[in-house]
A protein has these predicted regions:
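Short conserved segment of the HATPase_c
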Residues: 100-113
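Conserved DHp (HisKA) dimerization/phosphotransfer helix of two-component histidine kinases, i.e.
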Residues: 1-40
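Short alpha-helical Gxxx[C/S/T] motif in the catalytic ATP-binding
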Residues: 124, 129, 133
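Conserved polar catalytic motif of the HATPase_c/GHKL fold
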Residues: 65-66, 70
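Acidic ATP/Mg2+-coordinating residue in the GHKL
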Residues: 95
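Short beta-strand/loop element within the Bergerat-fold HATPase_c
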Residues: 77-87
Length: 163
């Protein structure tokens, strides 16, 4: 099973690495992901505006979609925000779920890593979503960090450079 997953990850990485950057309406992507989730009954909102950005579209979609899926899986709701700056675009996926302890936040980016407790096996998944999300953010020249949400929960912060 692990060898099959490794082969799948290698294939996906090769496909995304060869993808050519293009000008993308990131705001439309975020709004579309929110609308799709809302159509399935999810409590998700989007706020903020941004100008288009040169990115690999599949990589960005994979990154943001994995983060939104995690927020909805573990918290049952999410807020996605866009913050546009001259030098970078910041995308936040904010939830008020159980959160992740500060000392475990980097570990969740390791393949197949699963937390004990509320963010765990009951929710499904195999522990690859955060790995894929960070790898995609880094391929886009950006970074993905996890922070505590004020009042409780988790905020995933994607910072993408404007080139």
């Amino acid at each position: 099973m692990i060898s099959m997953l490794d082969a799948t990850l290698t294939y996906l990485h090769e496909q995304r690495t060869s993808e050519q950057p293009q000008l993308m309406d990131v705001q439309a992507l975020v709004e579309s992901l929110c609308e799709n989730a809302q159509d399935q009954g999810a409590d998700v909102q989007a706020s903020g505006h941004c100008a288009p950005l040169h990115v690999q579209p599949m990589a960005l979609r994979s990154c943001v979609n994995n983060l939104l899926d995690n927020a909805l899986r573990y918290a049952g709701q999410a807020l996605m925000t866009l913050e546009d700056h001259r030098e970078q675009l910041i995308i936040r996926v904010i939830d008020h779920g159980p959160g992740i302890a500060a000392e475990q936040r980097e570990a969740v980016f390791e393949p197949f890593f699963r937390l004990e407790g509320s963010r765990n096996r009951n929710s499904g998944g195999v522990g690859l979503g955060m790995t894929i999300a960070r790898e995609a953010a880094e391929r886009l020249g950006g970074e993905l960090k996890l922070e505590e949400t004020p009042g409780g929960g988790l905020t995933a912060v994607i910072r993408l450079p404007r080139i």
